[in-house]
Regions:
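SDR active-site lid
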Residues: 170, 174-236
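Conserved NAD(P)H cofactor-binding loop of Rossmann-fold oxidoreductase domains
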Residues: 89-94
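Canonical Rossmann dinucleotide-binding motif of NAD(H)/NADP(H)-dependent dehydrogenases/reductases
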Residues: 2-33
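Residue(s) in the substrate-gating loop at a strand-loop-helix junction
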Residues: 141
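Substrate-binding pocket helix/loop in short-chain dehydrogenase/reductase
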Residues: 97-98, 102-110
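Active-site helix of classical SDR
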Residues: 121, 157
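Conserved glycine-rich Rossmann-like NAD(P)H-binding loop of the short-chain dehydrogenase/reductase
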Residues: 30-46
Length: 289
């Protein structure tokens, strides 16, 4: 059955980013009311102000601050009195190697990627229960199934978030709340642009990164037909799940993937340069603001 967006309240974290802004636009086009959460106030306002329809809301705050999460949900309550769809989408990653990065940066990444969606989901629960058809949707990653050596903290957060949402989904189904997670592979977003120039995980570039449209289509499918997990590229999900049957084989398998990934990485950098997203400055790529 096709999901009816009309007058549904969507709360989307990371709403100023690639996937979040695309989902917000689609929800608004179909008659939904969008509440965007993001740390970047200028970009968030630009996204929300550019949406079709009326009665949208931008709330800029730090998701790692528990008191600000509560204030944001109180604001949603005062304006809409319910949440129909909560989308946990905000995430960060770092190309810093584990043995070189600070303890503070590790804590911050775990706070944003793992703790904040769990706390937000809990704080939003009363408003979700006021909906006739409450949904919780979360952007995970194939990094929640397959370990990434260059970004182990990101892997930690996504493994944990995947497990949490599976458990929450099993529990809340009995209470009438549908929980769905989307597990995309590399997606052409500003976060991936940054990771590409900072020397992130080359395995992400074995195939050309998918578009945000491809990922948003998985969200729409899960609204129409709720599932605990959905993969924008099912073939890639099977590959990583098969590879994880015997983790001890990973050190032998990785060299087979890295060469292809490095070639794809170089190709992607050239594409970003051609699109005017990055520039080469003295042999080092930089994002063009």
């Amino acid at each position: 059955m096709k999901y009816d967006f009309r007058n549904k309240v969507f709360v989307i974290t990371g709403c100023a980013g690639g996937i979040g802004s695309h989902l917000a636009r689609v929800a608004a086009e179909k008659g939904g009311q969008v509440v965007g959460f993001d740390l970047n106030e200028n970009k968030l306002n630009k996204v929300i102000n550019g949406l079709p329809g009326e009665n949208h809301l931008a709330v800029a705050f730090d998701l790692t601050n528990k008191s600000e999460i509560k204030k944001a949900i109180e604001l949603v309550d005062s304006k809409y009195h319910k949440i129909d769809v909560l989308v946990n989408n905000a995430a960060i990653t770092s190309a810093e190697r584990f043995d070189e990065r600070s303890v503070e940066s590790i804590e911050n990444e775990l706070d944003i990627n793992l703790l904040s969606p769990l706390i937000l989901t809990r704080v939003a629960m009363d408003l979700l229960k006021k909906s006739n058809d409450p949904r919780i949707m979360t952007t995970i990653s194939l990094g929640g199934i397959f370990p990434l050596g260059e970004t182990p903290i990101y892997t930690t957060s996504k493994f944990g978030l995947r497990g949490a949402m599976l458990g929450i989904g099993l529990d809340l189904k009995r209470k009438g709340i549908k929980v769905s997670s989307i597990l995309p592979s590399a997606t052409d977003t500003p976060m991936l642009h940054r990771e590409a120039i900072e020397g992130g995980n080359s395995l992400q570039f074995m195939d050309p990164p998918q578009t945000t449209e491809k990922v948003v289509q998985s969200f729409l499918k899960s609204l129409d037909n709720p599932k605990l997990e959905r993969y924008p590229k099912p073939s890639e999900s099977w590959l990583v799940r098969i590879a994880m049957v015997v983790p001890d084989f990973l050190p032998k398998l990785m060299p087979l993937f890295v060469g292809r990934g490095n070639k794809g990485h170089k190709k992607y950098l050239k594409e970003l340069e051609k699109r005017g997203i990055i520039k080469n400055v003295n042999g080092k790529f930089e994002i063009i603001d």
